[in-house]
From Swiss-Prot:
This is Aquaporin-3. NCBIfam families: MIP. Its main location: membrane. It comes from Milnesium tardigradum (Water bear). Induction: Expressed in early embryonic state, adult active, and adult anhydrobiotic state. Transcript abundance is high and expression levels are completely unaffected by desiccation or rehydratation. One of its GO terms (biological process) is polyol transmembrane transport. InterPro entries: Aquaporin-like, MIP, MIP/Aquaporin.
Amino acid sequence: MAISWRTWLKKTIHCDNSYVRTGLAEFLGTFLLVLLLNGMIITAHMSVRNADGTMAHPLNTAHLAFGGGLAVMVAVLVSGGISGAHLNPAVTTTMLVMGRLSPLKSLVYIFMQYMGAFFAASILYAVYFESILAYDYGERQVLGANGTAGWFATYPQEHISLVTQIFDAILGTGLLVMGIFAIIDPNNMAVPKGQIPLYVGFLISSLIFSFSYNAGAALNPARDLAPRLFLWVIGYGAEAFTARGHLWWLVPVIGPHVGGLLGGVTYQMFIGAHYQSDRKLKPATIMDEDDDTNATYNTITTTTHQKVYNGRRNFDESVPLKTVHA
């Protein structure tokens, strides 16, 4: 009997190793995030430039916000069922500290996130090489009228101090992680698994609307540092790191990690720790460590009355009591 190519492919390359599966998912998810997000930024800049090099009109914040939200939504849709779609080292670090991810797997996640972002920057540069050439006339510039480095990495406004840059990154990423915790918390609004990517996309759009002016919404270390390294490799030079101050490049790397931890702790202190004991459920969502049960948002053990929450807002007393690893 003939088998389909999909069946053959699955039998040929299927891997049961959790580290490999989740690593591949994080690579592809982060690749898509950076590819679509930065591609949208490039399109937004080029669409407001006249043939003579002048700006036809300012950048449309709505374009950037909705484009960013859609990019994240697609990335989470693609990779969420396998790895939980962290796609951000700051999110992974927070999950590690909160006990939702093992130390070794967190290293795999973060490494593959940076790799996916770097590869996305290289593909995007190849796709838009001719357009970038027409934009900057062959002279790679980081900032200025013909600067294109900001299409790949974040740079603050000239008048923004280092202290404000740090506060901006911490606050923005703190709100990001707080929002993610609320979305994936089955004790809260119990967002269905299939709707999680949509709500995370809305969250990103809201943050870009609110925190993109100072420094371009520096919320993701992988999305920022990996493309910045690519810029340095292809000829933008050390200025890719030193523009707007020699310390700026560290802000989008360190700040989001601090902000993510603060956001996660804040959510637990103000919301997560205050559910009534008779309705407290054990979180197991697509943002948790990969597992055949929790990665697909299956079931969550509740009380000894053998009522099992199945992710669809109903209880089934016929399901045997079991423990779900989160």
